[in-house]
Amino acid sequence: MSLSSLLWAFWYILPAYFANASPVLVGGGRPIDGGRYWKDGRRVFGDGKTWRGLIGGVAIGTAVGALQYFITPEFYGSLGKALLLAFLLSFGALFGDLVGSFFKRRIDLPRGSPAIGLDQLGFLISALAFAYPVKTLDSGQIIFLLVVSPFVHWGANYFAYKMGWKSVPW
Amino acid sequence: MSLSSLLWAFWYILPAYFANASPVLVGGGRPIDGGRYWKDGRRVFGDGKTWRGLIGGVAIGTAVGALQYFITPEFYGSLGKALLLAFLLSFGALFGDLVGSFFKRRIDLPRGSPAIGLDQLGFLISALAFAYPVKTLDSGQIIFLLVVSPFVHWGANYFAYKMGWKSVPW
């Protein structure tokens, strides 16, 4: 495992990180569950998961992929492949986040409360799974991302909290 | 991704699953933190993490690896490599679990309360990282294990709860 292979792993996953972080900035609006309740009497996803956050996050992540293609075209091969990869990483990240919210509501964690592990890893695993058919990393790079992403995630959230973008530091 | 490659992924990770599950059966005894408190006034790991659970779990996981070698020697190459791999997978799994307990105590989750995600993925990621230098999987197999392990984990814990081995179903 060379240093450059670890940097390429971050470069690969960047759209997923942007998509996962962007609802903090572009979120709000109509909730995806339309205010509906699950059969346990609790919200399906909650007010924290909105269409604007989902669509905005996928758009931002995919735009990041377009920028990445123009910086390192040889890493992607073609603009079409770069855009498809970034779309799948972004959609995968937000889909994983949504599934996480579903499980958090089911065990009755209130919106915004931490699910230590799920919040830091669910979006990443989902992004890796969605993007796998188009382009993947080697196993060492994946293990590296899994080990360091929780710390990146906590650092980024603490920064967003200090900047006043989030009301809680996780 | 063929079916057999997914079955090999389970076969590879089996010592980690056994090590992670075994403290339920062989646990108890003297806690690893010796009853000591962290500077936040809470226990370092708590009474749930004991020397007997750690050593018993590593022993059971490594014994599983020895059995695996005699069933599929060609997968490991040599008994020494199979034992080393099983030891690293088992120790890695329990080390990840211990780190998870440390973080759970820091955010003041009581012993046994669920950290959705961390409990299902922390031991797995740690096992994969420790075992990586000896033998690893391909990226598709790793992503597969990450996606399905939470469900295996929940199923196994629910079974242990129904059998009366655990007091809570998670």
Curated annotation (Swiss-Prot), chains A, B:
Its EC number is 2.7.7.67. GO terms for biological process: glycerophospholipid biosynthetic process. It is a multi-pass membrane protein. Its cofactor is Mg(2+). Pathway: Membrane lipid metabolism; glycerophospholipid metabolism. It is an enzyme of class 2 (transferase). One of its GO terms (molecular function) is CDP-2,3-bis-(O-geranylgeranyl)-sn-glycerol synthase activity. Catalyzes the formation of CDP-2,3-bis-(O-geranylgeranyl)-sn-glycerol (CDP-archaeol) from 2,3-bis-(O-geranylgeranyl)-sn-glycerol 1-phosphate (DGGGP) and CTP. This reaction is the third ether-bond-formation step in the biosynthesis of archaeal membrane lipids. This is CDP-archaeol synthase. It comes from Thermococcus onnurineus (strain NA1). The lineage of its organism: Archaea, Methanobacteriati, Methanobacteriota, Thermococci, Thermococcales.
